Amino acid sequence: MTVHTTDTPSPDGDAPDRRSLHERIAADLRDEIMSGDLAPGAPLPSTAQLKARFEAANATIQKALQVLKDERLVVGRAGASVTVRDHRQRTVRPAAYLAPSAPGEPYRWLAEAAKLGARAQSTLLDVREVRPSADVAAALRLAEDETAVLRHQILSVDGEPVELVKSYYPTAVARGTAVAEKRKIRGGTPALLAELGFPPRLSTDRVSARVPTQEQYQALRLPTDLPVLRTLRVVYSDDDRPIEATVMVKAGHLYELQYDFVPE
């Protein structure tokens, strides 16, 4: 496969790829890693093979490989070939985390990560009343200028930050409860909300790819401006009442989401 360097549009009318050559090479190799064509632990083609395949100079190939190293997709050691990291991408099944944890059990996200042999941790960054963004306010059906209780945390796996989470709760639900206190909640907020009389009945996800904000870029230690996966999840209780709206942001090159469903 050859990466063309011309800016001339193709005959079918597609716009030219204006990225630098090393970025295009990294993009093709990244796709092969994430699709499994380059399996975990497998060596990447040699520099000579990549130079021939992409008609590129040695320095360009090295820049492309450095991009993949910075993204934690491959690892290189002196005197050895560059290989695909064992945990190149994690598949998340949102439905596995929605039910409240059993009494005394840890939050489901932590428990599910442990089942996969990963060391997961949540760090609570802030808890306070705020005016949420317009999409969150609409999801919670808040009046104009009405506030919500924000619980802001960052999730890490094996010491690496992987997800930035901002959960918002109507003050009528959260004010005066542990949800509004700056401390962790055993079993997570779903279990506490159920105890408070607001069991989760339905969750709706809206997933989009976004360019990371400055906050997201820094918190997730992103190596480049690769897109992030942004999920707006709205949780409803009895009588179709929204009780939680959560904005979750994951590094797009490290995660994929899996949804299981049947036709309506």
Language-model regions: role of each:
Residues 2-24, 52-53, 63-139, 143-144, ...:
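HTH-adjacent hinge/linker in prokaryotic transcriptional regulators
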Residues 12, 119-264:
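C-terminal all-alpha effector/ligand-binding and dimerization domain
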Residues 24-42:
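Short helix->loop/beta-hairpin flanking segments within DNA-binding domains
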Residues 36, 41-55, 68:
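A short alpha-helical element within helix-turn-helix/winged-helix DNA-binding domains
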Residues 45-46, 64, 81, 126, ...:
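Residue-level "edge-of-site" marker
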